[in-house]
C-alpha cells in the first residue's frame, strides 16, 4: 500500500496532472505542492464546470482534504489572494483547507519586472518564461537575500529587508535594463495588507507530513510543469527554475525521501511544449495542427499555443530513470481518434549518423537530432469518455501496450476526457 503518492509530469508540462490529482484525492487526506509557482496551470473539469488553478493545490475542491503549499514553491501573495477570492466567491472555504510553509519564498513586483526586462533584453534568444517572476524569486532564494512567508511575522524587520533587496534590484532594472524602478512603498503596502492572512495559514509542514505518515494517512504530492523542464535534468537552459522531478518532493516539502511509496508519471499520448527549446518530434504539418485543435493545446496560464508532435519515448525513458516511476497515467488518448496512423519516436539519429536511445545531456547536442519513428495503425472509433479498457479499439490497446514495452513501465490509469469520471483506474496508486 502506498501512503505517499507523487503525481508529476513526464514531458514538458501540460500533461493533465490537475485532473488526475483531483481524481485520486478522493482518498487523500493531504495534497501538497512542492515546487514551481503560479506559472503552473492545472485545469479541472467536474460535472462540466471548469476550474483553473495556478498556485493552490488541486485538492482544494475536496471537502475533508487539506491542501499544502510547501517550501519549494515560490509564492506570489497577489496571485494567491486572487485565486483564493475566485474560489471563495464560489463558496469554497479556502482558508479552512489551505496551509503554507513559512519557508516559501515570496514573489513580489520587482521579480516580475526583472523577469520581463530580461526576456525583452534576450530578444530572439528569449527562453519563453511566463513572465511571472518565478526565476528571479528562485535566484533570490539561492542568493540568500529572498524574503519568505515567515518574514511576515515581524513586519518592521520585513520592511527593512524589503528596502535593502529592492535597492539592489532597482539598481539593475534602471542601470542595466533601462527599465523603470519598482515603487518600494507600494510593494510594502500591498504585502502588509495581506500579511496576516498569509501568516494565519502557516504550519510546520515537515512535522505535519511526518505525523501523517505515522498515522498512515494518504498524502498526494502534486508536481507542476514536467520532468524535461527540470532545472538540473531538463533541456537546459530552456527549463523552469525548480526541480520538477521526484527528487523535488523531499526538498520541496520536508518529507523524508525514503517515505515516497509510489511515483505516478502523467504521460500525454502525444507530445507538446510551450516556449523555446529542443523538441525532436515537433510537427509542422496538418497532423500537428490536428493535434493542437483536437487537444485544445493552448496554455492554461499564458494562453500561448503549444507546439505539438508525436510521443517521444526516448525522452520519456529519461523521465522513467530520473523519477523511478512506478506507473503511468496516459492522458488525452482520445485526441488521437481518427488518425490513420500514429507514430512513436523510438530512437534519435544524431548529426554524425549514430543512432541513440537516450536523450542528449547538453542543449547544443540536441541540434540536428532527427527522430526515428515506429509507425502503427490508428483507429477511427471514438475513445472519448470510454470508462472500461474492453471498450477501447484494438489499435488503441496496441498503442498502449507498445508504450509499456518501450518504457518498461505499466500504464495504471487511462484518461479519455477532461472530466474526472472519464478515467479508467487499472491500478490505484494508493493500493499499489
UniProtKB/Swiss-Prot annotation:
Active site per UniProt: 14 (proton acceptor), 42 (proton donor)
Keyword Nucleotide-binding applies: yes
Any one GO cellular component localisation term in the record: cytoplasm
EC number: 6.3.4.4
Keywords: Cytoplasm, GTP-binding, Ligase, Magnesium, Metal-binding, Nucleotide-binding, Purine biosynthesis
GO molecular function per UniProt: adenylosuccinate synthase activity; GTP binding; guanosine tetraphosphate binding; magnesium ion binding
Biological process annotations from GO: 'de novo' AMP biosynthetic process; adenosine biosynthetic process; DNA damage response; IMP metabolic process; nucleobase-containing small molecule interconversion; purine nucleotide biosynthetic process
Record text on cofactor binding: Binds 1 Mg(2+) ion per subunit.
Main location class: cytoplasm
Effect listed in the UniProt record for changing residue 19 to R: Significant reduction in activity
Superkingdom of the source species: Bacteria
SUPFAM superfamilies (alphabetical): P-loop containing nucleoside triphosphate hydrolases
Residues noted as binding substrate in the record, renumbered to the chain: 300-306
Residues noted as binding GTP in the record, renumbered to the chain: 13-19, 41-43, 306, 332-334, 415-417
Cleavable signal peptide: none
Annotated phenotype, changing residue 20 to T: Significant reduction in activity
Binding residues annotated for IMP, in chain numbering: 14-17, 39-42, 130, 144, 225, 240, 304
Names of required cofactors: Mg(2+)
Top-rank EC class of the record's enzyme: ligase
Classification via SMART domains: Adenylsucc_synt
Cell compartment(s), UniProt: Cytoplasm
Quaternary organization: Homodimer.
Family: Belongs to the adenylosuccinate synthetase family.
Protein name in the entry: Adenylosuccinate synthetase
Source species of the chain: Escherichia coli (strain K12)
Gene designation: purA
Amino acid at each position: 500500500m502506498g501512503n505517499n503518492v507523487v503525481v508529476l509530469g513526464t514531458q514538458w508540462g501540460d500533461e493533465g496532472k490537475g485532473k488526475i490529482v483531483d481524481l485520486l484525492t478522493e482518498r487523500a487526506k493531504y495534497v501538497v505542492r512542492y515546487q514551481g509557482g503560479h506559472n503552473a496551470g492545472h485545469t479541472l473539469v467536474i460535472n462540466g464546470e471548469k476550474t483553473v488553478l495556478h498556485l493552490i493545490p488541486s485538492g482544494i475542491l475536496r471537502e475533508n482534504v487539506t491542501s499544502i503549499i510547501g517550501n519549494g514553491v515560490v509564492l506570489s501573495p497577489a496571485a494567491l489572494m486572487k485565486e483564493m477570492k475566485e474560489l471563495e466567491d464560489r463558496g469554497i472555504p479556502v482558508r479552512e483547507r489551505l496551509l503554507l510553509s513559512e519557508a516559501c519564498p515570496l514573489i513580489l513586483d520587482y521579480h516580475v519586472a526583472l523577469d520581463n526586462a530580461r526576456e525583452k533584453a534576450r530578444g530572439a534568444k528569449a527562453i519563453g518564461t511566463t513572465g511571472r517572476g518565478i526565476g528571479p524569486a528562485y535566484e533570490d532564494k539561492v542568493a540568500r537575500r529572498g524574503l519568505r512567508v515567515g518574514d511576515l511575522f515581524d513586519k518592521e524587520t520585513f520592511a527593512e529587508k524589503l528596502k535593502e533587496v529592492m535597492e539592489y534590484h532597482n539598481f539593475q532594472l534602471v542601470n542595466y535594463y533601462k527599465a523603470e524602478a519598482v515603487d518600494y512603498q507600494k510593494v510594502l503596502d500591498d504585502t502588509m495588507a495581506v500579511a496576516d492572512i498569509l501568516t494565519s495559514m502557516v504550519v510546520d509542514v515537515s512535522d505535519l507530513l511526518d505525523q501523517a505518515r505515522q498515522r498512515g494517512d494518504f498524502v498526494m504530492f502534486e508536481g507542476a510543469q514536467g520532468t524535461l523542464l527540470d532545472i538540473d535534468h531538463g533541456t537546459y537552459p530552456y527549463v523552469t527554475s525548480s526541480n520538477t522531478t521526484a527528487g523535488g518532493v523531499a526538498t520541496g516539502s520536508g518529507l523524508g525521501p525514503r517515505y515516497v511509496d509510489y511515483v505516478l508519471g502523467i504521460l500525454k499520448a502525444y507530445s507538446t511544449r510551450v516556449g523555446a527549446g529542443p523538441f525532436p518530434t515537433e510537427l509542422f504539418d496538418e497532423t500537428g495542427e490536428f493535434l493542437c485543435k483536437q487537444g485544445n493545446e493552448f496554455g492554461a496560464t499564458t494562453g500561448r499555443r503549444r507546439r505539438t508532435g508525436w510521443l517521444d519515448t526516448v525522452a520519456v525513458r529519461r523521465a522513467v530513470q530520473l523519477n523511478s516511476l512506478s506507473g503511468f497515467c496516459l492522458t488525452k488518448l482520445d485526441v488521437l481518434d481518427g488518425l490513420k496512423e500514429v507514430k512513436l519516436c523510438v530512437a534519435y539519429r544524431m548529426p554524425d549518423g549514430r543512432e541513440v536511445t537516450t536523450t542528449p545531456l547538453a542543449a547544443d547536442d540536441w541540434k540536428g537530432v532527427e527522430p526515428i519513428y515506429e509507425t502503427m495503425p490508428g483507429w477511427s472509433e471514438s475513445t472519448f469518455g470510454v470508462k472500461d479498457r474492453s471498450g477501447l479499439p484494438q489499435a488503441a490497446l496496441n498503442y498502449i501496450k507498445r508504450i509499456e514495452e518501450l518504457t518498461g513501465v505499466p500504464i495504471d490509469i487511462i484518461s479519455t476526457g477532461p472530466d474526472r469520471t472519464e478515467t479508467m483506474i487499472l491500478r490505484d496508486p494508493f493500493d499499489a
